[in-house]
């Protein structure tokens, strides 16, 4: 299925809903009131990640790499999980919310990269455009497209770091049992 890009206004709405979901959850409310006029695209199944930063540092990032749920449902669950369920961080406290910036990444479905030789993988990766998933057995790691840019990585460094995110050796992509996928993301921030 081909996915049309979201508009800037739709992206802003997603970011607002993600923040509302976090705020309501931290208040103990189970009744998140969504606008009645949500765009139809919010009901399409899409992959989505919600990233939280506090004063420029990662504070939580959780999402759905695959389009398994309607975007609005996946967004709300990812937002709450990023704030309360990322095992790398303690749960966000209500008093932290003013210092938290919310970012929403809406993903295209991951596509497997087919190569003659594993050494060819880096040539198929567009840093700053593609996100990566590396998978071998039960191990799976994902890095969003913006991560490589933020860290100044080239394509091979991005691939190695995605391997390590999966808990695998950095050169695991040379193993024929390893699968590499790429995807793209539209990234929306609270500041526009």
UniProtKB/Swiss-Prot annotation:
Reading the lineage from the top rank, the first entry is Archaea
Q: What's the protein here called?
A: Protein MTH_857
Record-linked Gene3D superfamilies: Hypothetical protein ph0010, domain 1, Hypothetical protein ph0010, domain 2
**InterPro entries with a match to the protein in the record:** AMMECR1, AMMECR1_dom_sf, AMMECR1_domain, AMMECR1_N, AmmeMemoSam_A, Uncharacterised_MJ0810
Which residue range or ranges hold the AMMECR1 domain?
A: 9-192
Q: Which HAMAP family match?
A: AMMECR1
Checking Pfam families in the record gives:
AMMECR1
Protein's organism: Methanothermobacter thermautotrophicus (strain ATCC 29096 / DSM 1053 / JCM 10044 / NBRC 100330 / Delta H) (Methanobacterium thermoautotrophicum)
